[in-house]
């Protein structure tokens, strides 16, 4: 197997390939152009999107040429893959703004200065003539075959709109256009994209005669059953305005022990020998590996300086010392404080809990601290006098901490 593919396989990235042997031979012979696509369905990507872009970084390190494809066009349709119901149709203005923010996020992670492209499929999809598209592209698609793919089989029971049914044709056309424009030979995506990717490979092969390939990656899950990319605060976004760098660091710092080695392989560039060494211990000794994991992935997404700040803040929060300023904070407006504010109301306002009942349960269980002092009264109130130097420290359990600032 080709060296680049061996690296991906060893680190747990490979799931399915349209023809692994032929792809390996091609990659031994030349540096290929490959692409990863992502739709602009929200203002930020989350860590569930990171896996294909980690693969992109690995292949780029081996000299292969990446294309980041942002789905400014396909987002107008909505991918039914992995969805139980039709996606909400977004306004064009919202899609355009999402394209800008997602592009900015990815360019902080993927350096294209030495080769590579970032493209928006709206460039060729927005101007399509529907009749011509059906004649030039639709002719290569079998409805029977499309319905055999799991994406469509699942949705047929609950309803599949015609607009979503067109999505596979558009994604396949993307591959055809990238093959024609940039000599792209490989599409990479999550395993839920297998049907779309196979259809794209087939379209390129039949319409242009070019030999291209598709590669899918496993959908990553956590050993505790929680969905990858979800936390108590919701999605773990890559945008620091939506999910702080500190919380991003802490998400990886606090993963289950059983996931440490797997995530070190997936989310860092550490060598195999080092991963095996630091992940071979158990219990409290594994905390060092978790800190390394958290630092490395935070460095990839947010940069080394921000990773250092997050690491320093985490140590300051739980051991005392410098770094307090890097702990996330919530700005409490004086109008909310008035004479005083109930702690349970403050916890909801600061979004550390989702409801007052959850706040009360945490207080009753002894898991809430104000300036390192446990609070045992559900009716505990805070007033201006509590905010020494204009702030207090709110701690929930051992792992969640927030500065409340006036």
Curated annotation (Swiss-Prot):
One Pfam family this sequence matches: SYY_C-terminal
Top class in the EC scheme: ligase
Main localization category: cytoplasm
Residue span(s) of domain S4 RNA-binding: 341-405
Residues annotated for L-tyrosine binding in this entry: 35, 167, 171
Enzymatic reactions: tRNA(Tyr) + L-tyrosine + ATP = L-tyrosyl-tRNA(Tyr) + AMP + diphosphate + H(+)
Enzyme Commission number, as recorded: 6.1.1.1
InterPro entries given in the database record: aa-tRNA-synth_Ic (IPR002305), Rossmann-like_a/b/a_fold (IPR014729), S4_RNA-bd (IPR002942), S4_RNA-bd_sf (IPR036986), SYY-like_C (IPR054608), Tyr-tRNA-ligase (IPR002307), Tyr-tRNA-ligase_bac-type (IPR024088), Tyr-tRNA-ligase_bac_1 (IPR024107)
Keyword Metal-binding annotated: no
Molecular function in Gene Ontology: ATP binding; RNA binding; tyrosine-tRNA ligase activity
GO BP field: tyrosyl-tRNA aminoacylation
Residue numbers covered by motif 'HIGH' region: 40-49
Binding-site residues for ATP, renumbered to this chain: 230
Localization: Cytoplasm
GO cellular component annotations of the record: cytosol
Subunit details: Homodimer.
HAMAP family with a match to the protein in the record: Tyr_tRNA_synth_type1
Function summary: Catalyzes the attachment of tyrosine to tRNA(Tyr) in a two-step reaction: tyrosine is first activated by ATP to form Tyr-AMP and then transferred to the acceptor end of tRNA(Tyr).
Protein name (Swiss-Prot/TrEMBL): Tyrosine--tRNA ligase
Gene name of the encoded protein: tyrS
């Amino acid at each position: 197997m080709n060296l680049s593919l061996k690296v991906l396989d060893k680190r747990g990235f490979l799931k399915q390939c349209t023809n692994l042997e032929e792809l390996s031979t091609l990659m031994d012979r030349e540096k290929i152009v490959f692409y990863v696509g992502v739709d602009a369905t929200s203002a930020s990507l989350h860590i569930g999107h990171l896996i294909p872009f980690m693969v992109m970084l690995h292949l780029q390190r081996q000299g292969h040429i990446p294309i980041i494809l942002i789905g400014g066009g396909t987002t107008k349709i909505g991918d039914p893959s992995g969805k139980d119901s039709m996606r909400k149709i977004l306004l064009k203005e919202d899609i355009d703004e999402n394209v800008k923010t997602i592009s900015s996020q990815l360019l902080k992670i993927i350096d294209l200065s030495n080769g590579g492209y970032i493209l928006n499929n709206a460039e060729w999809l927005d101007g399509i003539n529907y009749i011509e598209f059906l004649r030039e592209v639709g002719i290569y698609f079998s409805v029977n075959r499309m319905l055999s793919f799991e994406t469509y089989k699942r949705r047929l029971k609950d309803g599949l709109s015609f607009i979503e049914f067109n999505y596979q044709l558009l994604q396949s056309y993307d591959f055809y256009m990238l093959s024609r424009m940039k000599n792209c030979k490989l599409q990479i995506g999550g395993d839920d994209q297998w049907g779309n990717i196979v259809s794209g490979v087939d379209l390129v092969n039949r319409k242009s005669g070019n030999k291209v390939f598709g590669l899918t990656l496993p959908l990553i899950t956590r050993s505790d059953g929680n969905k990858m990319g979800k936390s108590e605060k919701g999605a773990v976004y890559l945008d620091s305005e939506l999910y702080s760098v500190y919380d991003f660091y802490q998400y990886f710092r606090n993963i289950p022990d059983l996931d440490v080695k797997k995530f070190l392989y997936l989310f860092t560039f550490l060598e195999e020998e080092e991963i095996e060494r630091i992940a071979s211990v158990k219990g409290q000794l594994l905390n060092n590996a978790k800190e390394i994991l958290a630092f490395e992935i935070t460095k990839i997404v947010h940069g080394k300086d921000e990773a250092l700040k997050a690491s320093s803040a985490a140590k300051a929060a739980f051991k005392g010392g410098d770094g307090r300023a890097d702990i996330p904070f919530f700005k409490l407006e004086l109008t909310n404080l008035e004479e005083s504010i109930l702690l349970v109301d403050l916890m909801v306002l600061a979004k550390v809990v989702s409801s007052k009942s959850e706040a009360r349960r945490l207080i009753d269980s002894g898991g809430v601290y104000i300036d390192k002092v446990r609070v045992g009264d559900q009716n505990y109130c805070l007033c201006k006098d509590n905010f020494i130097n204009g702030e207090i420290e709110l701690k929930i359990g051992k792992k969640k901490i927030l500065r409340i600032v006036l």
